[in-house]
Amino acid sequence: MELKATPRKSQEKLAPGMIPAVAYNKEKNVTFAIERKAFDRAFRQQGTTGLFDIVIEGGETFPALVKAVQMDKRRREAIHADFYMVTYGEPVEVSVPVHTTGKSQGEIQGGLVDVVVHSLNVIAPGPRRIPQEITVDVTNLNIGDHVTAGQIKLPEGVKLAVEPDLVVLSVLPPRLSAEELEAQAQAAQVAGMVASGELSEAAAEAVLEGSASLDAVKAGEEGSRAQQETEEASERADQGQ
């Protein structure tokens, strides 16, 4: 996509509607100005993987990729753009967005596909062969499954620029509601109390079934133990007479 620009010296005042920009590589950098609206439209369409032909008025023309965009947070518009100059036919490393397709078996079971890496660094054989996105089919994934960078099929000639064992996405189990989390915590607490002898198995069953509250059962158990201790003390006293 062609993007027209005007030459600009550093700190030079900008014409209305223009934003400063710089393009660079290992050998040189060029400063210029571009129309904000034209850049916004082009960047929404091309992103960081789309190739731009920067045409500087009265100067050179070169291919480049968007490296970074500084935004005005309040107005939500670009205020500065960085481009990286590339050379046709030479490999180039880029960050490509990761998208999923299909509905996983895990999602059907109530789970969730968690995309951990939203953009994957790859090396394309040339600027014109940069993939616009990387698509991962999650249809056959079950809860607990994950996909690593090395398992993703890339376009011909495109190579990974990250470790192949990098986890890109995984399928998580269903999220528990607040009530389910509370019930889970109570079950663990009750199990611990049974193990320590604080609750009888019958009392624990009543709590877990919802027929009695834990506080009520604890009070009842404590009362029973106190009564038993009193009876035992009385029995010992009778035997001592």
Curated annotation (Swiss-Prot):
Oligomer and partners: Part of the 50S ribosomal subunit; part of the 5S rRNA/L5/L18/L25 subcomplex. Contacts the 5S rRNA. Binds to the 5S rRNA independently of L5 and L18.
Similarity remark: Belongs to the bacterial ribosomal protein bL25 family. CTC subfamily.
GO cellular component annotations of the record: cytosolic large ribosomal subunit
Protein name: Large ribosomal subunit protein bL25
CDD domains (UniProt xref): Ribosomal_L25_TL5_CTC
Biological classification of the source: Bacteria, Thermotogati, Deinococcota, Deinococci, Deinococcales
The species this protein was found in: Deinococcus geothermalis (strain DSM 11300 / CIP 105573 / AG-3a)
Positions of the UniProt region annotated as Disordered: 214-241
One GO MF term attached to the UniProt entry: structural constituent of ribosome
